[in-house]
């Protein structure tokens, strides 16, 4: 449990959090403090234990579960208490985009449309094309696949591993005379239910919708089962978030870019894609703070991805609900304060960004002043909308 004070709203964006510790002499349920400049007397702010609910797209599970655990551990060490309840069994579809959810915060792979949520990037997102060829080593062996060949495999037009199109890309590999088994997410059957991983994959393929092979495909219930199936089924192929591929030590392909180079997903190649292809839309500077309008969320512009950059890359976002009348009640305000505290931790270099290294994702905030400014203004906008 971690206690977060309302005064945390006023702390600088990347400020050390040691000043959030409560006074030991103050009663547990009521800490009243005000700062009277004329008398130099301090009385306190109401500090109450707060629980926030978090949901995420299932593809983000490997690092979101780490975020929640490490945030609570770090805050316990500093005598605070926000209880973060991660509803890991609830999937967020692309159509939802975090809107209409029964939670305080959602981690999503695609910003929703036609809702009032605000989106702050929290991590890179990359899709690994994973496969199981028993005669190949159980490490990233670098089977080469380009967008044309991969599309033909996934739609069932190419059915054999030793097809001429695959052999042309991999002349040094002894490809087996075996049928290809395509494993896909069972929910990836329409635009309204597609996972963010499939959205990114289809963007790379240049094909808006996926048509899975009728006779040689298997539907998994989600990314965890998809990864497990590919590991168990010989001669299978599928797609998962890179963090799942790393966590389960899967074999994944080197993917062709527009220049004819083949890039294996890694912290370096994903980070390079983010560095060169991140597109941040600036806030308008000619408005008063109360009139600031949220620009479109930052995105990865695929057309900017060049050599040495993994081509199937996007972003994960913290989807923050717009402030409504219900959230202006005392309990609602405290939950928003706690939620913003968690989001601030996610994007700090020593907090959530450091945690990403455990799944071989690159931190996206260190050295990126434009992205940090975007996040700060977004958080400030929400804070100013609160009635304290």
Name each region found by the language model.
Residues 1-9:
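Hydrophobic membrane-insertion alpha-helices, especially the h-region
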Residues 11-388:
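Flexible loop/hinge segments at secondary-structure junctions
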């Amino acid at each position: 449990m971690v206690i977060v004070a309302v005064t945390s709203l006023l702390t600088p964006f990347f400020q050390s959090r040691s000043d959030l510790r409560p006074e030991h002499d103050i009663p547990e349920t009521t800490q009243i403090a005000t700062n009277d400049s004329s008398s130099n007397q301090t009385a306190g702010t109401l500090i109450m234990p707060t629980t926030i609910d978090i949901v995420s797209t299932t593809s983000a599970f490997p690092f979101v579960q780490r975020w929640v655990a490490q945030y609570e551990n770090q805050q316990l060490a500093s005598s605070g208490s926000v209880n973060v309840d991660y509803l890991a069994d609830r999937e967020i579809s692309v159509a939802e985009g975090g809107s209409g959810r029964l939670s305080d915060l959602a981690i999503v792979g695609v910003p929703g449309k036609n809702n009032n949520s605000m989106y702050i990037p929290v991590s890179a997102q990359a899709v690994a094309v994973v496969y199981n060829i028993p005669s190949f080593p159980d490490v990233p062996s670098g089977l080469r696949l380009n967008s044309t060949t991969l599309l033909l495999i996934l739609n069932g037009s190419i059915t054999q591993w030793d097809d001429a199109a695959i052999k042309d890309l991999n002349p040094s590999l002894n490809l087996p005379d075996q049928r290809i088994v395509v494993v896909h997410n069972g929910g990836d059957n329409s635009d309204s239910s597609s996972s963010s991983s499939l959205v990114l994959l289809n963007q790379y393929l240049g094909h808006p919708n996926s048509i899975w092979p009728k006779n040689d495909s298997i539907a998994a219930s989600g990314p965890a089962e998809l990864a497990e199936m590919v590991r168990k089924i010989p001669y299978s192929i599928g797609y998962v978030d890179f963090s799942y591929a790393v966590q389960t030590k899967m074999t994944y392909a080197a993917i062709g870019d527009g220049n004819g180079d083949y890039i294996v997903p890694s912290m370096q190649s994903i980070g390079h894609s983010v560095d060169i292809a991140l597109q941040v839309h600036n806030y308008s500077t000619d408005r008063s703070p109360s009139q600031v309008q949220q620009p479109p969320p930052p995105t990865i512009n695929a057309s900017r991805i060049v050599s040495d950059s993994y081509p199937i890359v996007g972003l994960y976002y913290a989807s923050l609900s717009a402030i409504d009348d219900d959230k202006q009640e005392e309990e609602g305000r405290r939950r928003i304060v706690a939620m913003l505290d968690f989001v601030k931790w996610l994007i700090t270099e020593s907090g959530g960004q450091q945690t990403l290294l455990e799944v071989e994702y690159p931190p996206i905030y260190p050295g990126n002043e434009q992205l940090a400014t975007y996040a700060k203004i977004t958080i400030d906008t929400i804070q100013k909308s609160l009635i304290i």
